[in-house]
Amino acid sequence: MLHLINPLRTSVRSVVSTVPRRAYSTPTKSGSSKLVTVGLPFGAAAIAAYAYFSGSLGGASTAEAKAAAPAAPKKPVTSALDPNAFVDFKLKSVEKLTPNTSRFIFELEDNQKLGLDVASCVVTKFAKEDGKPVIRPYTPTSDADLTGSFDFVIKRYEGGPMSMHVHNMKPGDVLAVKGPISKYPIATNQHESITMIAGGSGITPMFQVVNELLKDKEDKTKINLIFANVTPADIILKEELDTLAKANPDRFKVTYVIDKAVDDWTGPTGYVTTELIKKHAPEVGSKNNKVFVCGPPPMMKTVSGTKGPNFTQGEVDGALKELGLTSEHVFKF
């Protein structure tokens, strides 16, 4: 290509220099018009060719220069949460999960993650009409390393001021959030096995832990989840849990329990009892097994005993006490 272009450039200069400057406007001497008639078409073609090849080379050079230029450095990932102050986050979208539970997706900057430890929660706040603040803890369910957004899965409780407030929010509204508040720090291969007993929205801290452990390819912890709900329609995050169980059959098992049998239900029904735990979680009580419990107060009372005052763990009671477990083996979210 270069061998062709150099002679072409010479030809263009030669032709352009021979074209009379005023040939286009005033009569010329006899015979001179032949030069103009022949010179203009050739000159136009040559100039066009010169422009084409010059442009092509210039374009290639520009493209090569762009390709060779170093990519702009990525912005470092930062944490959006502040443990000492409430930060307003804008609601991006809402996804209905069950008749009374929805996923609320909040916006972050592209290079921001929420800034959670696992397992941890945050506190949310809004002011009532009388100006009094309502503050409630919630556990985000999105991946701790996710950037650009984070999720809450929140069940609506009639008469519950915060849950009703969040369920009445529209995209563009903001919610004040502070944290994180560490609950039970999780480390790789910290336990040989973990038994989880959850009820209703008590699945959220369990899901956070399950997701964190299963994405760690170095971790070998076996996780057994017993998840109790009123009806099959009330099971929160079932699709996500089933997907994780299918992808990790040697590490994660889920048993769903509902209050009363329905026509097509094949799983266990009724309360989470000592017998049900022994049948579906035989690892309970074994060496280096930890039991996590989270659910509504009536379930907590019958399974593990309620938490103590000022957010302390309290004594182990109920079914887990009957199985010989103590505070050393059990953690209540």
Set out the residue ranges of the language-model regions.
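Hydrophobic/small residue at the entry helix of a nucleotide-binding pocket
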Residues: 201-206, 299
